[in-house]
């Protein structure tokens, strides 16, 4: 044990002694009640589990979330999480034990106390502050310390997340009978990330162990791929860095998905409830899903999606006017708009409105060489036609800035997701008729995307 980790643990020992003076165990031990929220049970089930983390700062990133409101964070996480992790280390993560009861009161899930635990006192303190589980790191503890600390946790009906980061610690975790093992993809000695650690260590943990992959997970593609090795994921920094936390969680759990061609407020709500991030409003008069500004306002009133206006060879002033009055998050160009058009549009649009460009894919991939284009939509050229192009063209391509469109529905969305684009763009495949979305089809698509 050395460098960053050694320094943190040395400082933690000093903190523990000071806290014992300030808040002696005898002053609160009689008030401690056993946990009634079962951490081990919460991570069981057919679907991949998610431990979502409340984290203000870290040694590798500094302050991650300025506007850190644990109650608000927990109120969002409760819709997605199997358990919620709370950083309580003060010096390096700007955490606090005071965050634990706030989160516990704001969400029904088991609460994990994430700290560098080296003393039974910390576990009693965590339970007093309403934690239902604690992290024990084999990089910090010897076997005797681990046995003592896990026994204290279990005596309080708390769960233990046992963290490992190499083969030696994996062997120890097995010998110690750890039920839930977290594989930390971050090397706590130099803070580097290697997702291969999960791939290498998980298969050797054996049956009956719940495997959680920790650190460095920030995309839906990573989650889908690593879900073959892990039963769940602990995710913090990738979520905390985003202002729109709800969208950030959806982006990782489901992908960056859009439902296009919305014409009714109830359909916007159904899309949002199902798990979409973006809602598409089509301002192309020839489309059967075209809407006016008034209709668009009505759609937007239905749900807090990020709305994208779809245009085709439109007058730039018209695009900007609609973007302004409807507070659009992005404008999507579906015509023959060239670089000069995009340049002029970028100059005229507010900076916070993105520009997306739809590209038709037939026999070969088009170049993504526009300046000032934030995302591309790959379609078969006839938006809303329900036809797909040959997805094998996308193999081996970097697709972080691409949404895949064309003929997407419940029967092919998983295959589409595995292509590796940032997200999927649904339209006719979730409709009962053009412009009328089917809430059951929407729910089915997103449940299918989450079934891993």
Swiss-Prot record:
Residues 1-256 are annotated as: Indole-3-glycerol phosphate synthase. Its EC number is 4.1.1.48, 5.3.1.24. Keywords: Amino-acid biosynthesis, Aromatic amino acid biosynthesis, Decarboxylase, Isomerase, Lyase, Multifunctional enzyme, Tryptophan biosynthesis. NCBIfam families: PRK00278.2-4, PRK09427.1. Monomer. Bifunctional enzyme that catalyzes two sequential steps of tryptophan biosynthetic pathway. The first reaction is catalyzed by the isomerase, coded by the TrpF domain; the second reaction is catalyzed by the synthase, coded by the TrpC domain. HAMAP family: IGPS_B, PRAI. This is Tryptophan biosynthesis protein TrpCF. It comes from Salmonella typhi.
């Amino acid at each position: 044990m050395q460098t960053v980790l050694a320094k943190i643990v040395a400082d933690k020992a000093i903190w523990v002694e000071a806290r014992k003076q300030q808040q002696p165990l005898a002053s609160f031990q009689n008030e401690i009640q056993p946990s009634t929220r079962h951490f081990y049970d919460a991570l069981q089930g057919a679907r991949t589990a998610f431990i979502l983390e409340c984290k203000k700062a870290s040694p590798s990133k500094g302050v991650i979330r300025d506007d850190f409101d644990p109650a608000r964070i927990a109120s969002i996480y409760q819709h997605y999480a199997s358990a919620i992790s709370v950083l309580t280390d003060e010096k390096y993560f700007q955490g606090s034990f005071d965050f634990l009861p706030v989160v516990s009161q704001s969400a029904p899930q088991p609460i994990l106390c994430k700290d560098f635990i080296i003393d039974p006192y910390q576990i009693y303190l965590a339970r007093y502050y309403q934690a239902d589980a604690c992290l024990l790191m084999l990089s910090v503890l010897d076997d005797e310390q681990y046995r003592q600390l896990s026994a204290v946790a279990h005596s309080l009906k708390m769960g233990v997340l046992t963290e490992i980061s190499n083969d030696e610690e994996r062997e120890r975790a097995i010998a110690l009978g750890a039920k839930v093992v977290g594989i930390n993809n971050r090397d706590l000695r130099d803070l580097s990330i290697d997702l291969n650690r999960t791939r290498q260590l998980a298969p050797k943990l054996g049956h009956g162990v719940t495997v959680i992959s920790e650190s460095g997970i920030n995309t839906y593609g990573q989650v889908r791929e690593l879900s073959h090795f892990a039963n769940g994921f602990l995710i913090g920094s990738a979520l905390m860095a985003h202002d729109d936390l709800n969208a950030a969680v959806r982006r990782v759990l489901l992908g960056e998905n859009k439902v296009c061609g919305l014409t009714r407020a109830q359909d916007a709500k159904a899309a949002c409830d199902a798990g979409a991030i973006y809602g598409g409003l089509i301002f192309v008069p020839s489309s059967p899903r075209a809407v006016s500004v008034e209709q668009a306002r009505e759609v937007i009133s239905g749900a807090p999606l990020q709305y994208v206006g779809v245009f085709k060879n439109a007058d730039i002033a018209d695009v900007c006017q609609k973007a302004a009055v409807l507070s659009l998050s992005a404008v999507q160009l579906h015509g023959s708009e060239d670089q000069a058009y995009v340049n002029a549009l970028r100059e005229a649009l507010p900076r916070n409105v993105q520009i997306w460009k739809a590209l038709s894919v037939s026999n070969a991939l088009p170049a993504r060489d526009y300046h000032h284009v934030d995302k591309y939509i790959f379609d078969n050229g006839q938006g809303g036609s329900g036809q797909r192009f040959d997805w094998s063209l996308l193999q081996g391509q970097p697709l972080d800035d691409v949404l895949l469109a064309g003929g997407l529905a419940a029967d092919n969305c998983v295959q589409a997701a595995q292509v590796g684009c940032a997200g999927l763009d649904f339209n006719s495949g979730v409709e009962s008729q053009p412009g009328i979305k089917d809430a059951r089809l929407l729910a089915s698509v997103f449940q299918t995307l989450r079934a891993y």
